[in-house]
Amino acid sequence: MQKNNKGTIILPVIISLFIGALGTTLVFLNFSSNGNGSIIQNVNKVTITENSIADAVNKIYDAVVVVEASKEGKQISTGTGFVYKTKDNVAYILTNNHVIDNSDDINIIYSDGSNTTAQIVGKETYSDIAVLQVAKSTILSVAELGNSKDVKIGDTLFTVGTPLGKKYQGTVTKGILSGKDRLVEVSLSGNVTDYIMRVLQTDAAINPGNSGGPLVNINGEVIGINSLKLV
């Protein structure tokens, strides 16, 4: 995914999948920021302990935002995102490409109800990832990034998002990692398979509006992004 002519985002990704009434989560592998505008691989070990889920939620909560996309003055999409890094006076938000695609105005709403306008830094269709930027002075918190390779089957995971619109902003759902290394065929046109993604399986409930929100481990670290819902 190209960030623009100022830098490149290197983003190995997989998707996690739960087929049924739950959802699909796009998961970053070994990511962290190097402070130079890139996301790079990081192999630090994450020790997961069953501490209070409330503590983990509190750690990530204010970094999660509502993303409202509009075109010609009409709202066309609502999703979720999270602040993942800052540099100088700019803060960067990760969300899904399909949340902001075809929009000409993007409104960001923080957990305290304040809002600001975001600009698109880069986006990529296949991974369904978009990077937005806002003024650093507007944000409330920055998420801590974990390592999805360290998550084990049965580990507790949770999501924070905006299911069914901003009325339910900040909704938390909890589940476990149900499986690893699933392969899912993805079609952009609906007729043919365009590519195959390696996925993790989770039973954490994901609904429309959660797209772009974080999948989080028990330490309050982001290990993935909710990408789309399969039923």
Where are the regions that the model predicts?
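C-terminal cap/linker of serine protease catalytic domains
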Residues: I19, G23-T24, G37, N51-A56, ...
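C-terminal recognition in membrane/secretory proteostasis and scaffolding
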Residues: M1-N34, Q119-I120, Q133, K152, ...
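N-terminal activation segment of mature serine protease catalytic domains
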Residues: T25-T86, I93, S103-D105, I109, ...
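Residue-level recognition of beta-strand microenvironments
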Residues: V67, Y84-T86, N97, V121-K123, ...
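Conserved active-site neighborhood of the chymotrypsin/trypsin-like protease fold
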Residues: G73-Q75, K85-K167
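Terminal peptide-recognition signature
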Residues: G23, D62-E68, G81, A91, ...
